[in-house]
Amino acid sequence: MVKYRTPAPQNIRLTFAGLAAGVFAVVSGAQAHEPAGEATYLANAGVLVSVCGEKILFDAFYEDSYGRYALVPDEARQDLLAGRPPYDEVSALFVSHVHGDHFSPAPALAYLRAWPDVKLYGSLQVADALAKAAGSDDEVLQRVIAFDLEPGAAPADAVHDALSIDVVAIPHSGGARMSDIDNLVFRVSLNQAATVMHLGDAVADEALFAGRQAHWDARRTDLVFPPFWFFRDDAGRRILENNIRAAAAVGVHVPAAAIGQGDGWRDESGGDLFTDPGETRVIGDIVCAAENR
């Protein structure tokens, strides 16, 4: 296991300029050809992101619905493990936190063992859960990158293949009852062509997000995945519009009751949401380098 305790100094060139403050819906629809950038919904907060041939997974391996949230459909779970399209050639897994509707050790370990070139990025709590399930001497743990970050700590970063990764700790929503859960916000640039961000179950606290403004501004985010309640909360909306300032946002963590009712949920929330496993969204106007086409 690789452990990040003291983040290295940030060396990210400022590229944020001229972005409109609003949050724009991502356009989905039939394509004449495979889009250069696309997000595919697994279920709950699980998303596959593909940009110019580079693929990553957020919160994809979990086993608990808590009686409220959708599980990844069996067929998709099988396709993930087998590496069948669109789940082929994945480079990395990202885990926001240890709750069972975002992460379970057994399916994550099964995937890592099936795909020996894939790395997993998460908190120390995630790494500890994997080590407990696998045994501390299991070689698979060498591909687990653990970030030891407290809220208020400097962001950390990492590079893996064509991925440029940075991560910051934002507390889990729910106040004191969730204070023992480490929630990480990952921002990942793929092939230097597009950048996505996953908020996990971050609290919609404007002061906390404003205190990280230099971090949010350090790179332009093309698509952010907030928990859907950010759209239903005035503070959450202001965070997306004034702090994150991504080109587009698609809410996740939508209850299973929304399956088949997406239009109604989107209308009620006033923003775009992933509601049905298998849904896709095109990510912006991406130009791939010739070698990645």
Set out the residue ranges of the language-model regions.
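N-terminal secretory signal peptides that target proteins for export/translocation
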Residues: 1-11
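Active-site HxH/HxHxD metal-binding segment of metal-dependent hydrolases
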Residues: 82-151
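Active-site-proximal loop/helix segments of hydrolase catalytic cores
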Residues: 171-243
